[in-house]
Amino acid sequence: MTLGPVGRRMEEALRTALSPDHLEIVDESARHAGHAGANPAGESHFHVIVVSPAFAGKSLVQRHRMVNEALGDLLGERVHALRVTARAPGE
């Protein structure tokens, strides 16, 4: 699936902040159409899968915070829900 403008901004922010070995961003908005917080234009619900050396030695909570910090204002402006899978290489 091709990412829209919000997904592309997320990808750029995560690549810049975390230098991931693997990054996958899945727009799950269609699965939430009609739910509270769903934007009719889409790009409101995402799942990000990130494998980054930056996560080595970090707890799950720390990893999620790192992802949230990297995405910054996108989380409040456009992204209603974010599911995160964050791993260090080899996990």
What is the meaning of each model-derived region?
Residues 19-21, 42-46, 78-82:
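A generic structural signal for short beta-strands and their flanking turns/coil linkers
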Residues 2-39:
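N-terminal first-folded block
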Residues 32-35, 45, 64, 80:
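Histidine-centered active-site/metal-ligand motif
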Residues 58-91:
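C-terminal structural segments of small proteins and small subunits
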Residues 26, 49-51, 85-87:
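Solvent-exposed beta-strand sheet faces enriched in polar/charged residues
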Residues 34-52:
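A short, structured beta-strand/loop element
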Residues 50-60:
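A short interface-forming secondary-structure element
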